[in-house]
Amino acid sequence: TRKECPLDIMGYDIDKKTIGLARENAVQAKLGNTIHFQQQPLSSLSSRKMYGKIICNPPYGERLSDKKEVEKLYKEMGKVFGKLDSWSHYILTSHSDFEKLFGKKASKKRKLYNGNIKVDYYQYYGPRPKHTHKFFHEELTKSR
């Protein structure tokens, strides 16, 4: 038998309406009780957990009026995510200067499309959790 790893999924956004829509989508996907949603600013993001993953699709700043705000957000993301340096970060954006604004070159960058918008998927790999290897070794040993 396969032992399930605990899964802790959280969704954050500063906008209350966006959180409501995300919650509705989770319920429709039958994941309503699996994901914890919370309205909060990016600057409040923190965790006591040693390892984790952040996956985000921030605003792209496609409209000229939003560009400066988005660039400010990307700089803040770099500072906030930098405090979680043992975590992996995955960011989807169309902004060509994202790495410069974020303050770090991605471990890997993939070109994708989000609808008809050409985007880049920036992957920043954190260290692998040491206990993961032990968990899988124990599972392999049990199954033999």
Regions found by a protein language model. Give the residues of each.
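Class I S-adenosyl-L-methionine-dependent methyltransferase catalytic core
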Residues: 1-144
